[in-house]
Regions:
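Beta-barrel outer-membrane channel/assembly domains of diderm bacteria
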Residues: 2-111, 116-136, 145-156, 166, ...
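Detector for outer-membrane/organellar transmembrane beta-barrel domains
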Residues: 154-282
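Short glycine/acidic-enriched loop and turn motifs that connect beta-strands
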Residues: 139-140
Length: 334
């Protein structure tokens, strides 16, 4: 009996060790949308999405696979394999290789869509306080393209972070982030090698009492230059859906937004007011959004978002139209 108990204990410990470096995390959300336009037409839509992240680890090497399950997909599209990559160290170099996207917090992240590149590799190291790196992407046929080669650096200067990255024969990006006089500053410039194709983004935030105030803006030389469609800052983006600049809103070359956020009795309240700036011959399209979110005892978070937005691409002299959207979101992370 003792031998059986010892064997069982050993087996349990071995099993625990075997799975100790494998983890599964994720999140899920259910969304309801009620939209009414100027003509009085009302639509009701819903969406269910589950995201799962699998991570395996061996020493300094990790392997990540992220999956998205969407209720509205068919047999071919309901399951989307998103990020699939590994990270490791080779001497003093950090290596990330596979299919992965950049976030909106990355340099130029609020300007360019952080699309996934096939078989991308990112190699970086530190030289004192300076981080330098090289990033190489491939096309959908796994063919390495020179136009997808990027070098970058991040340098701390007097409490600020200065960043630069250059994509050969395409653009050079600059960014600074820091704080001055109680105001948090993030400013980024994309200088294109193509004439009249530069984009400036900046975001300023400060806290007054219990309220966080913000002002953010994007200023482009022309329409069609901004591809990010899932901003973490703006209530309305200069691009829609997916597809990068191919889905940029037509006749829009800028956006500005004022915001205020606070907490009231456990509810996080945010107000955003702004405007999509139109190109010559079109009307600017204003928008406002108020949202409230609260963590529930069940472990979920309930969010209610109301957005009133004018329609872009309405020519000067034409009657402006708008829409009102009520969104209810029930989300959980695990």
């Amino acid at each position: 009996m003792k031998k059986q108990m010892i064997a069982a204990a050993v087996a349990a410990s071995v099993s625990a060790v075997a799975v100790a470096d494998i983890s599964i995390t994720g999140n899920a959300n259910y969304e309801y949308f009620n939209t009414e336009n100027t003509a009085g037409v009302t639509t009701h839509t819903t969406d269910t999405e589950i995201n799962l992240s699998f991570k395996g680890k061996s020493g300094d090497t990790s392997v990540v696979a992220n999956l998205e399950i969407d209720s509205h997909g068919n047999a071919d599209t309901a399951l989307d394999i998103e990020d699939t990559y590994m990270t490791t160290k080779i001497g003093d170099f950090n290596v990330k290789a596979g299919n992965f996207a950049s976030s909106t917090s990355a340099l130029l992240g609020e300007i360019d869509a952080g699309g996934r590149s096939t078989s991308k590799v990112d190699i970086s190291t530190t030289l004192g306080d300076i981080k330098v790196g090289y990033n190489q992407g491939s096309n959908t046929s796994d063919i390495v393209e020179n136009s997808a080669s990027t070098v970058y650096a991040s340098i701390p200067v007097a409490g600020w972070t200065v960043q630069v990255k250059d994509q050969s024969d395409s653009y050079t990006g600059f960014g600074v982030a820091g704080s001055i006089g109680g105001v948090n500053v993030r400013a980024e410039q994309k200088n294109s090698d193509t004439a009249n194709s530069n984009v400036l983004f900046y975001n300023l935030t400060t806290k007054v009492g219990d309220v966080t105030l913000g002002y953010a803006a994007i200023d482009a030389d022309a329409s069609g230059l901004v591809g990010e469609e899932d901003s973490s800052i703006f209530a309305r983006e200069m691009a829609t859906g997916t597809g990068g600049t191919s889905n940029a809103r037509s006749d829009v070359d800028g956006v500005w937004q004022l915001s205020a956020a606070t907490a009231v009795d456990g509810n996080n309240i945010t107000l955003k007011v702004g405007e999509l700036r139109a190109t010559t011959g079109n009307q600017d399209a204003g928008f406002s959004q108020v949202s409230a979110s609260r963590k529930l005892a069940s472990g979920t978070t309930l969010s209610v978002i109301y957005t009133d937005a004018e329609t872009e691409s309405i020519t000067t002299g034409s009657t402006m139209t708008d829409s009102q959207t009520l969104e209810v979101d029930l989300a959980v992370s695990f």
